[in-house]
Amino acid sequence: MGAPPKTAQNLSFVLEGIHKVKFEDRPIPQLRDAHDVLVDVRFTGICGSDVHYWEHGSIGQFVVKDPMVLGHESSGVISKVGSAVTTLKVGDHVAMEPGIPCRRCEPCKEGKYNLCEKMAFAATPPYDGTLAKYYVLPEDFCYKLPENINLQEAAVMEPLSVAVHIVKQANVAPGQSVVVFGAGPVGLLCCAVARAFGSPKVIAVDIQKGRLEFAKKYAATAIFEPSKVSALENAERIVNENDLGRGADIVIDASGAEPSVHTGIHVLRPGGTYVQGGMGRNEITFPIMAACTKELNVRGSFRYGSGDYKLAVNLVASGKVSVKELITGVVSFEDAEQAFHEVKAGKGIKTLIAGVDV
């Protein structure tokens, strides 16, 4: 990959094909609506989906057919506002919600805009992402930051919003026990949000010792490394070692791994709640007998919806959730591809790419 142009107006990090990226100077995007704002992007976190597109060129039905700007976990500074904008001004620091729904379909009108079939989501084909100098969003999808949240932390609001949505789907209430499978960024944030929602017992489960050690220091009250035994045996150990009685109240899977799904179902008490937040293979086997006989509440969770981003910002602003510990590396925009290699190699927790000229 060549060096970025020296005089670029809107330098962008573009995926052309599998493991084929380039820097490209693109036109500065124009405001499409009177309520739009132009954001000078300052920091962008790298998500597993970004790496998946870089490695495979597709995720399920979403296939990169034309060159696409990567990135969707971003923060920035307002550079220009539309004529009808009333809540933001030039110079405001914001967290950027990267998916714009149609606002007219039934899911949108029901407040479930994350299920909008016409969602224009950053770095999801055919829509360009946020790894550019400038990006346009509606004003109500930019969240003004209080003074105690910096722009690096603001780039973590996107995965935090994913975790907020998962925990809300689980209806976590004070006093309930929660077991979280997967101690990657979203799983770790689920632990933190569950604690903020009042759970006194949050157990993180993962196969990587380093991730578990981080989870224990960060937000989990206990950790568990599965053995190479059956899902039922691992589930029994989790229950017994953590005094969960008849089982956990809530299980969240943030891994997408089939063994985690099986173990999670067996960990739950009768009448417990299971939420699938991690995505793995399209189809897996599922312990349907246990789910039926225990009358489990089984739910999915996808991205984030109404109020999730705002709550994410409020949780950090109030000190109930901290995200700065998750930021384990920052690279310059010119070294953007390095961040993808680091994430693929499993280095650190959350790597950020600084914006152009930052």
Curated annotation (Swiss-Prot):
Highest taxon above the source species: Eukaryota
Protein name in UniProt: D-xylulose reductase A
This protein's pathway: Carbohydrate degradation; L-arabinose degradation via L-arabinitol; D-xylulose 5-phosphate from L-arabinose (fungal route): step 4/5
EC number: 1.1.1.9
Binding residues annotated for NAD(+), in chain numbering: 182-187
Gene name linked to the record: xdhA
GO terms classed as biological process: D-xylose catabolic process; L-arabinose catabolic process to xylulose 5-phosphate; L-xylitol catabolic process to xylulose 5-phosphate; sorbitol catabolic process
Pfam family, one: ADH_zinc_N
Taxonomic lineage of the native organism: Eukaryota, Fungi, Dikarya, Ascomycota, Pezizomycotina
Family annotation (PROSITE patterns): ADH_ZINC
Catalytic activity: xylitol + NAD(+) = D-xylulose + NADH + H(+)
Entry's family note: Belongs to the zinc-containing alcohol dehydrogenase family.
PANTHER family associated with the record: SORBITOL DEHYDROGENASE
Swiss-Prot/TrEMBL keywords: Carbohydrate metabolism, Metal-binding, NAD, Oxidoreductase, Xylose metabolism, Zinc
Key word Zinc present: yes
SUPFAM superfamilies per the UniProt record, alphabetical: GroES-like, NAD(P)-binding Rossmann-fold domains
Gene source species: Aspergillus oryzae (strain ATCC 42149 / RIB 40)
InterPro entries reported for this sequence: ADH-like_C (IPR013149), ADH-like_N (IPR013154), ADH_Zn_CS (IPR002328), GroES-like_sf (IPR011032), NAD(P)-bd_dom_sf (IPR036291), PKS_ER (IPR020843), SDH-like (IPR045306)
Chain residues that bind Zn(2+): 47, 72-73
Listed cofactors: Zn(2+)
Magnesium listed as a keyword: no
Record's function text: Xylitol dehydrogenase which catalyzes the conversion of xylitol to D-xylulose. Xylose is a major component of hemicelluloses such as xylan. Most fungi utilize D-xylose via three enzymatic reactions, xylose reductase (XR), xylitol dehydrogenase (XDH), and xylulokinase, to form xylulose 5-phosphate, which enters pentose phosphate pathway.
One annotated GO molecular function: L-iditol 2-dehydrogenase (NAD+) activity
Record note on cofactor: Binds 1 zinc ion per subunit.
